[in-house]
Each structure stands twice: as structure tokens, then as C-alpha cells.
Amino acid sequence: MPIPVGNTKNDFAALQAKLDADAAEIEKWWSDSRWSKTKRNYSARDIAVRRGTFPPIEYPSSVMARKLFKVLEKHHNEGTVSKTFGALDPVQISQMAKYLDTIYISGWQCSSTASTSNEPGPDLADYPMDTVPNKVEHLFKAQLFHDRKQLEARSKAKSQEELDEMGAPIDYLTPIVADADAGHGGLTAVFKLTKMFIERGAAGIHMEDQTSTNKKCGHMAGRCVIPVQEHVNRLVTIRMCADIMHSDLIVVARTDSEAATLISSTIDTRDHYFIVGATNPNIEPFAEVLNDAIMSGASGQELADIEQKWCRDAGLKLFHEAVIDEIERSALSNKQELIKKFTSKVGPLTETSHREAKKLAKEILGHEIFFDWELPRVREGLYRYRGGTQCSIMRARAFAPYADLVWMESNYPDFQQAKEFAEGVKEKFPDQWLAYNLSPSFNWPKAMSVDEQHTFIQRLGDLGYIWQFITLAGLHTNALAVHNFSRDFAKDGMKAYAQNVQQREMDDGVDVLKHQKWSGAEYIDGLLKLAQGGVSATAAMGTGVTEDQFKENGVKK
């Protein structure tokens, strides 16, 4: 028998029976094809013992996660793309639902428009950690409301003909994928953040491999990544939290390593190939040189000049570059063969440790070369790092077993780079789902022709990028619309609103034209009447409501 909720009976056999039964249910859940590509570093019983005695709850977000999985699976099977953009508010999601099959919630947009501290700022993830989960709840509740409102309205049809007159229903329950930044702290913070997202309606979340303390927008300079395993631990924590909560949460692993210039630690051998070192043994540590200059009163520009000079004098290189340069300077006769011997064993995807690379270099050269990655460390204690597409491939391969989709943040909408990344990931994981940020930080008119813009999404889709999104389109379309209307209103008064807004709403059949109805006034009137025996003298949509003026404008009711 199951142990009662909040059980106080000290029965060992009953406890073991409950845990065995719960573990069996979890194993049955995990046997579904949904999890065929998912790796877990723990057992079903490990999850069972951490669930408590309360019966498992099916969170609405888990229903939406299963829906999202089916949406993405269909796109994968058909070679099509789920495309969406960052939504700001309930108005936007109610309109997006007519045409798009997913919704994105951007941390950047929340940082500038929806921080729970009400303090706007750039995308540094320094807002309270409940900011994006709160926006998810805001928009998810709006989705549920519009879904309820629509069903109640359609229930009034007395025949198939009347239902046909209403048109096809809108699927307002569009799965939401939200920005989890870099986790807002250590693994316990990642766990709590994931829990908030699940509780508040997110079908999926993405998390990047930047440090949480130095997190930057994916299109800012100075990005610092964490070691590969540290981000794997984050992804494992996300899935563990979802498993404990019996959630099918979709997990997107993002890497910012393509343009990363710093890394927090040298502990993971998979990162060693990309860590920058000094090759000049006579150079002083950079942090000491900079600190001395600061103490002597150097200005900002002087400090920048000092850093540039130090970097030139230090002979900064990756270790394999230093080895190749040393081979080419040597008197060895078969230089190209020796270089090939070294690079065949020390490459961006070989995961060779620095210790092993040094040993091989000594075997080839007959002596050790000077290379020190401690000397160039910056004042914050971070190591210099040179990422790139191959670095992103290495990391995406490491993240893939723990995530449903992988995503490389990039600085340009470069199709060839996207192709290189996709092929590099799929060489090891052929069925891996990919995501792509169609960022408004890119100068699209400068990057490609109009015809290329038109086909870009599907060309990426052909490479396996099944989920693509414009992170800040909600922000930019909002700004553009209000900019234009404010300008025209200042000049033309009510003509600007009547002709450029209201008339266009009529022409395009935008349901917000009847904003009282859109907001659910009729639905709420129905609730009031239901509560009061069928009548309400204070019904909002009764005689006298100004929205009656729109009855003859030809817009669908």
C-alpha cells in the first residue's frame, strides 16, 4: 500500500515497497522513446527517494513540454523549422499564436523591460533570478485565459454552420521556451531556477556555458565561459530537477564559446587546446603589471596601451601554435611530417590534455618549449581563451547527451559557419536537434541580400536547425510601432490613430480592435451571471458598451 501523505508510521517494509514502486514507475516513464537520446548520471531510485510522500503532480508545463517535443519532432522528421521570436506581453502572444507554434521569452527583453526589481538595464543577468520565471507565468496565464475565453465563446454555437462562421479555433496554448541565462549561481541556484520555470509554465529552457558572475549578452565582448564539465553539471542538475518534479521539460544547451575570450578555470582537459599562454619567459605576470600601473595613477587609455604592449611582448599563442612555430624554426628536416604528427594527436576535437601535448612536443622537438597560461591571467583571475567554431563543436558534443537541443551563439549570420557547426555536431550525433539565434544584433541588410534573407531560415533548417528564433523581435516591433505612431500622432492628431491603427485593425481583422472582448469582458460577464443565477445588472458588455459601435464594420465577431 502507498504511504499516506505526511506519513508518521515507522514501517521499513512499507517504505521500501513505496520506493521500489516509485522507482519502477520512473523507469517506465524513462523507457519512452522521448528519452532515447537522454543520458542520466543517476538511477530511478535516486529520484524516487527525493520526491517526498505527496503524490506526483502533473504540472501544466509538463503537458506543454510534451507538446513542444512533438512539435519539434515533427519539424525534425519533415525537414521544416519552428520559427518564433521573443514575446514581451499578453498582446503579443495572443497574436503570435495565430501563426507560430512556439513562443520565446528573452532574458535580454526581461532585463530591459520586466525585472522584478523594476530596475532596467542591459543583459548581464544581474536582475533577480525570478524575473524570467515571472514573465513566463505572466504570459502562460494569459495563454490559459485566452484559451478558456475562446472555448466559452465557441460553445455558444448551435450548429456546425454557426461554428464554421466563427472560423477555426486559435491554438493559444503555444509552448514557451525561456531564457535561464547561466543559472544565476551554483548548482543549487540552477535547481531552484529550474523548479521556478516548471512551476510557472515553461515548456523548455535554455542555459549557456558562461560564468554566472561575468555573464554577458551573447553579442557583447568580454564573454567568459566555464569548464566543459561544469556546464555539463548544470545540464544534469536541470534534468534531475525536472525528473524529481515529474516534468518532461525540454532542455536547450547553449555555448558562447565561439567568441569567448576568457575561461574561469583550466581544470577540464577538453578546454586545454583553446587556452592562451605566454611564450616569452622574461615577461612579468600581466595582472601584476596592470596593478602597478593602476597604483601609479595610469588613465584608462594608458592601461589599454599597457595591455596591448604586454600582449605583444608576451608572444601570446595557443600551445599547438607555439609547437608548430618551434618546429618551423628548428633545423629538423621533415618539418611538415612532424607538424602533421603533432596535429593529428592534438586538435580541437581530440580532447588532449596539456600534459599529453607537452610530452608529445618534447618527443618531436627533443626539448620542452616555454608556454605559461598563468602569466596572461587578467585581474579578475580569469584565463585567456580563444574559442571559435571548432571549440563550440567540441562543447556541443559534450552537452548533447544531456540536452534536447544544442545552440552555438555566433557573432554573424554566417551560413558556412552554421554548416560547419551542424556537420561537426552531427558527425558524432546524427539526429541531434539544433537551435539558431536569428539575432537582431546582426546587421541583416549588410550581411546578405534580400533573397538570401528570405531563404536563410529554411537553408538552416536543411542543416538540422529545427528551432530558430529572433530573440528581441518583440522589443523592436514594439519600439518601431510606437515610434511611428507617436510621430504621426504629434503631427496629425486623431487621423493618425483612426487611419494608421484602427482602420488597419479593421482591414486586417485584428481581434484587439474590440479590446473589451479581447480582454475577456464577455467571458467574465458570463461568470458573474453564472454566479448570480443568470442575470447581472453590472455586466460590462451590456447596453451602453461603446464596443457596439463596431458591429457594422465587417470584422468577424
From Swiss-Prot:
Temperature dependence, free-text field: Thermostable for 60 minutes up to 50 degrees Celsius.
Protein residues bound to Mg(2+): 179
GO biological process: glyoxylate cycle; tricarboxylic acid cycle
Residues that bind substrate: 106-108, 218-219, 254, 437-441, 471
Active site: residue positions: 217
Activity regulation: Phosphorylated and inactivated after addition of glucose to the cell culture (repressing conditions).
Pfam families assigned to the protein according to its UniProt record, in alphabetical order: ICL (PF00463)
PROSITE patterns: ISOCITRATE_LYASE
Activity's dependence on pH: Optimum pH is 7.
Induction profile: Repressed by glucose and induced by ethanol via the transcriptional activator CAT8. The promoter sequence located between -397 and -388 contains an upstream activating sequence (UAS)element whereas the sequence located between -261 and -242 contains an upstream repressing sequence (URS) element.
NCBIfam families given in the database record: isocit_lyase
Name of this protein: Isocitrate lyase
Encoding gene (name): ICL1
